């Protein structure tokens, strides 16, 4: 059913809006989820006209449109207001424009606000939305905020309090685009729609879980931002722990947003808080030095533009989380994430316990691999007999990949997540309880590192991280399942 809504985007001139938001809204328009009864108000400091704003929107969607006319018709629903987030008069003008558009498009007073700006402006915007009576209790009123949601627990808590002065928790949608990816959402299907997995998805059968977010790129033009953030804040506090919660949660009573969210929150509340000594042993950090991949030489992190040449910011982090629940108590959830690694990819490996062998030789563990990007799909390794006269065993892989046609037809993450917000489905968004629990644990690791309580390991560009990451798993009697650097070295592609 087509949504009736006025969407207001704060930060409408920014890169995210052009690359993600306008194309996602257009796909919703093409699919009929947005039709006649919607309008988009773009706000930013730049003094754009409506005509110029429309041209920006058309340019961002032209490759997706069936015709120029279709793109222009969609863009005609867009309106622009030059806006200073600190100026009350600008909010009064925004309220008047919203009222006019609500009447013109018969949007039934439904409002969606998207804060595509730096978090330090979130509280100011929320305060003015209430004081200038833009949030007036008529129709639905929902707020989407981009990460990062704070830089630690204290800033996140302050930000949350500022938003709660205007919006209820149920109205706030903290977006994490990774949760909009098709295969992450398919984890529910793999787990709960297949008896062979759900019955063994516990500490009795699973030895360890491995989560890898690998990037081949360096920090690129984000050096200034990244040097103040680092891999732990940038990737672990949100993406990694959100993915972990989907893997570790108990089966919800029903497939509803409230039941799913309740089970996810339980995982965050059950995250084991290590002792100080365990923190030093279970979490490592690294920083890339120069290296060569496929004949291309890459500079070290400290040589990147806008990066402190003596920086101690981590570009790689690895560790072991534990969930103190009946289902997974004692099972390590290993993670690693880093820049300038061998190959781009997001993989989850569920490593099952090894069976006692009756064949006189050790058996390889069964491994379920979930491929999230760049390819989507999953594989399951099983032990089988090798072809030949002798009875020799070898692991075989049952492999499935989503074909390009299906992948191309599936919604983009932002499209799916905006669709969810329009339909008041908060399943794939972070509740404050999740954010709170994750920051409290991440803050302890950050504090240890800030006090130089753990070494900063270096690793060569093109590798899969420092040796300490591999040593960490060995301490638990495990090893990383995905090691593309081995093949690259064998092929002479790494130096």
UniProtKB/Swiss-Prot annotation:
MF-aspect GO terms: glucose-6-phosphate dehydrogenase activity; NADP binding
Binding-site positions, substrate: 177, 181, 215, 234, 339, 344
Protein's UniProt keywords contain Methyltransferase: no
InterPro entries: G6P_DH, G6P_DH_AS, G6P_DH_C, G6P_DH_NAD-bd, NAD(P)-bd_dom_sf
EC number: 1.1.1.49
SUPFAM superfamilies: Glyceraldehyde-3-phosphate dehydrogenase-like, C-terminal domain, NAD(P)-binding Rossmann-fold domains
Pathway: Carbohydrate degradation; pentose phosphate pathway; D-ribulose 5-phosphate from D-glucose 6-phosphate (oxidative stage): step 1/3
Residues binding NADP(+): 11-18, 45, 84-85, 147
Protein name per UniProt: Glucose-6-phosphate 1-dehydrogenase
């Amino acid at each position: 059913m087509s949504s009736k809504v006025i969407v207001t985007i704060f930060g409408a001139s920014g890169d995210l809006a052009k690359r993600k938001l306008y194309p996602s809204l257009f796909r919703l328009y093409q699919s009929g989820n947005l039709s006649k009864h919607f309008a988009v108000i773009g706000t930013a400091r730049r003094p754009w006209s409506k005509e110029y704003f429309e041209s920006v929107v058309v340019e961002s969607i032209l490759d997706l449109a069936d015709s120029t006319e279709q793109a222009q018709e969609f863009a005609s629903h867009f309106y622009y207001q030059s806006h200073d987030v600190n100026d009350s008069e600008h909010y009064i003008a925004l309220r008047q424009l919203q009222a006019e558009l609500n009447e013109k498009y018969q949007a039934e007073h439904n409002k969606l606000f998207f804060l595509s700006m730096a978090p330090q402006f979130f509280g100011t915007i929320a305060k003015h939305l209430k004081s200038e009576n833009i949030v007036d209790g008529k129709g639905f009123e929902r707020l989407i905020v981009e990460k990062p949601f704070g830089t630690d627990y204290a800033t996140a808590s302050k930000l949350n309090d500022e938003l709660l002065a205007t919006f209820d928790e149920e109205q706030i949608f903290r977006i994490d685009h990774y949760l909009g990816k098709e295969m992450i959402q398919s984890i529910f299907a793999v787990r709960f729609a297949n008896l062979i997995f759900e019955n063994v998805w516990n500490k009795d059968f699973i030895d360890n879980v491995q989560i890898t977010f690998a990037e081949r790129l360096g920090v690129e033009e984000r050096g200034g931002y990244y040097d103040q953030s680092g891999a732990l804040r940038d990737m672990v506090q949100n993406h990694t722990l959100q993915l972990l919660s989907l893997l570790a949660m108990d089966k919800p009573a029903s497939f509803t947003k409230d039941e799913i969210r309740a089970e996810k929150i339980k995982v965050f509340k059950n995250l084991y808080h290590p002792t100080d000594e365990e923190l030093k042993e279970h979490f490592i950090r690294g920083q890339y030095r120069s290296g060569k991949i496929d004949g291309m030489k890459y500079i070290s992190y400290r040589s990147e533009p806008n990066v402190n040449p003596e920086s101690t910011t981590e570009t790689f982090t690895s560790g072991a989380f534990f969930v103190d629940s009946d289902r997974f108590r004692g099972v390590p959830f290993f993670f690693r994430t880093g820049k300038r690694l061998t190959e781009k990819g997001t993989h989850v490996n569920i490593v099952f316990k090894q069976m006692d062998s009756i064949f006189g030789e050790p058996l390889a563990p069964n491994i379920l691999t979930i491929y999230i990007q760049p390819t989507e799909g999953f594989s399951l390794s099983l032990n089988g007999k090798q072809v030949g006269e002798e009875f020799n065993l070898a692991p075989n892989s049952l492999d499935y990949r989503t074909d390009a046609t299906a992948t191309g037809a599936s919604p983009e993450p932002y499209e799916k997540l905006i669709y969810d917000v329009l339909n008041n489905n908060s399943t794939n968004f972070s509740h404050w309880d999740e954010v709170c629990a994750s920051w409290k644990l991440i803050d302890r690791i950050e504090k240890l590192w800030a006090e130089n309580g753990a070494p900063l390991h270096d690793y060569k560009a093109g590798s899969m991280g420092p040796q300490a990451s591999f040593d960490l798993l060995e301490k638990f009697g495990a090893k990383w399942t995905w090691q593309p650097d081995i093949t690259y070295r064998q092929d002479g592609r790494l130096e």
